[in-house]
Amino acid sequence: MSSIARPPDPCLVAIILIVRSRAGPRFVFHYPPNPLSENGLKPALRSRRTSRSRTGQGYKSNDSSSSEESGSSSDEDEDEHQHQLHSQSNNHSQTHLSGSVVSARRSSNFGLDDHVTMSVSPGGDSQRAGSIGSSRTLFRRRGGNSDVEEESGAGSDRQEDGAGTAGGPNRPPWESLLGLPADVWEKLLSPSPAWHKRRFEVGINDLAFIGWPVFVREDGTWRKQKRKKKKEKKKARAEWEGGELGHNENSEDAPDGEDGDGEGGGGLKLIVASTETLSPKHMTFSEAKRASVASNLAARASSDCLDVDDKDSMTMFNVVFVLDPPLLEYSMRIKELYDNIIKKFAKALKWEQARTDYVWREAQHITHLKEKAKERRTSLNTLYSELINQSSLARAIYTVFNSISASKIASVPLSPDVSISLQIPPLTSTPYLSGPADKAYPGLWLTTADSVTPVDDPTAEEIAAPHQVLAKNFALLLLDNEATILKDVEASGGALAPALAHYLRCSKPTKSFAQISATSGIPLSTIQMLASHLVYWRRARAIPPIHQRDTYIVSPNCDLSKLEVATAAYQAAFPTLPSLPKMLSALSGTPRPYGSFIPSKDHKETYFAILAWLLRGGWVTQLRSFARVKVTPEIKMAVEVALRREEVDKYLRKSRPSGPGKSGIDGEEGSGAEEVDDASSSSSSSLSSHGSGEETPMPGRYKLESEMRLEHSLLDRNTSLRTASLILFPHRASPLESRWLEEIVSQFPDKPRSANRLRGHGSGSRGGEGDPECAGICTPMKDLWPTYIKYFNGLDALEKIPIRESLKRKLAWQVLTRLGMVTSQQTSIELDPREQVLVSVRHWNNELIYFQFLIFPRDINSIIPHHAR
């Protein structure tokens, strides 16, 4: 598989709603009505299915290491499911679906007709590699031992007119899915209570069935009731879990006794005002609690009046998502859909079920409509139109399927009081250009500036949770007009609306989050939360702050097919300024700071707006600088001579106390040490005389043994002393690399050459030695080195230094120029060869730079693209 990060690919085939009452499981609803039809089956899905091998091997699934996501279904349930699945699949024939034109290829309905192979996974990150063979003998042998009491009465509650077979004459088309009758699916996808609030996964040939089953509690309620405290504490305004800030949700699936979703629990309190912005209407925490308590009390009162054998109460519901992910991306696609959609949608339904008995009421309503349609012999399309129009739950499933399949945000109103938004976070940028065998995504932002990775934030943990807080040194680039976003925020209302509106008015792409916090008075943590909210919901993008000293080039990944449309939009936004083709042509030349394109100070804000427009559309990208410390052979030799002298001195100090009575062996060792000392001294003298232009004659100077001794380091025999090296990670330098760095610093001059030139100006005059504008020129490099060295790892862009270290960019680039940073601008700084210790390149991709640094040819310009020099 390619290393290129791919955008969300939901691979959705269908969504199924299964409920279980005391009468047994029920196949309530599924969408689309016929996933195998030409309209329901996507071309990508067909190509994936036909490209897979049919070797007869099943899927392998690995148990999750998480205790919350682990667990296993009972053998009895699995045996019953397998037995029913086998018996039904052998008897079924062609299913009649309205509008379907796939009868000719029905023999390949994902392999469900003839060879149904299944594996049940307890959750976790599954890996589907081949398949388990069709164990029909095993199904028959173990099927007789099944014991599913709750499903025993299912037949009496369902159709009695020949519906037991898939090809029954009176079976309506909506009572089958993927070529199998509904009673097979309702038993297969109705797990035991051991799966309560855990990832339920079933693999059947090329399809994966993923759900998050929810069971009623033993006391008949759907939420754990907290004991009332004597002193009522003032409760903050909060919403149900899983809303628009649900992407920051860290609560795990708690067991029934530790229900994290209950009132007063962490579930509700963690998502303060989470669903308010850009959603219709919401309930406060106190209102939700009162409604939930009233609903539970009513449920208890009604249950007391009902007979113990009452069959009209729901005990479980399971919303199952049917997926067909690519084989090599199976775990990744399953995980992203489970974490972002399946689990959150089921939690929202659980919350509404506990509050208003929502799922059970809607399930009964859908069943009633289906029974009426069966009596009237309504067509499939007509029935689904009625269901979507009259049932909010059917409409919610319809909305989720269509929106998530298109990688859009699904805004789902469950009731007048609650609306949720679900999405799979899209890919906003890529550090790679697609190769010949990879699918191209033109227009995607090409950069390695990741606002949350440990590379861009050294203080971040290496194993960071998804959707972590944005780095404080990044800025916010709105992806739509500010007035439009403000209008939507103000219209949505909610607790977040005033804070978001205030932040949007203060935010600028030229100011980092930390700078906005300092000037506006908004706490940094609040700004990071609001910015994360906007980024997650596709209203903004986190970027390095725009600056006139930064360099921008036309992105190699820009979508030139949209140039004509973009030119018209650009002309409407900036009618009196150079056209889009002219701006792109100017930025395609020799890279230079963006400030050189600005005609005057009066045009500064306007040209920043142009740059923001170009970045928003992926037309340009920042040309970033990367550097590593170069260790020359002279530095290596000096360190090696010092190391060998230290070893000889250490040996001589140990041998001196032995006195004149030392043994012959000691004498031989002493003579050997003297020989090494002589060789080191001769090499040192040779180097010093070579540096001064003189050559001191020395006995044995040209001996091969002495020459061989100084070809490799004493500390690392694999390190050559005759070639230059790069220090990959200065903050994790090896002992030998640390000695090299010490030697480099020791050779820095105490007084910079530029300081001598500026000394005549005086300390108080403009441009003199005491001028802060010249601090980068006049300050000794030994004092500046500790601040800068941690960025010379080839991974951190040097443009970060002024932002992170709160330095003026002019000062930072003066120091980098002294260290050997190559720029396109001519500089008047007098350079000292002793300070030129960097090898630098400019590119958008630090991975490419890392590869270039590793091969390190003598002429590094030979591998750097022309536009990156």
Curated annotation (Swiss-Prot):
GO aspect biological process, one term: positive regulation of autophagy
Q: Extract the signal peptide range.
A: 1-23
**Pfam entry (one):** HTH_NPRL3
- List the InterPro entries hit by this protein, alphabetically: HTH_NPRL3 (IPR056603), Npr3 (IPR005365)
| Record region (Disordered) | 30-175, 222-266, 652-700, 751-773
The UniProt similarity line reads: Belongs to the NPR3 family.
What is the protein's name according to its record? Nitrogen permease regulator 3
Please name the source species. Answer: Aspergillus clavatus (strain ATCC 1007 / CBS 513.65 / DSM 816 / NCTC 3887 / NRRL 1 / QM 1276 / 107)
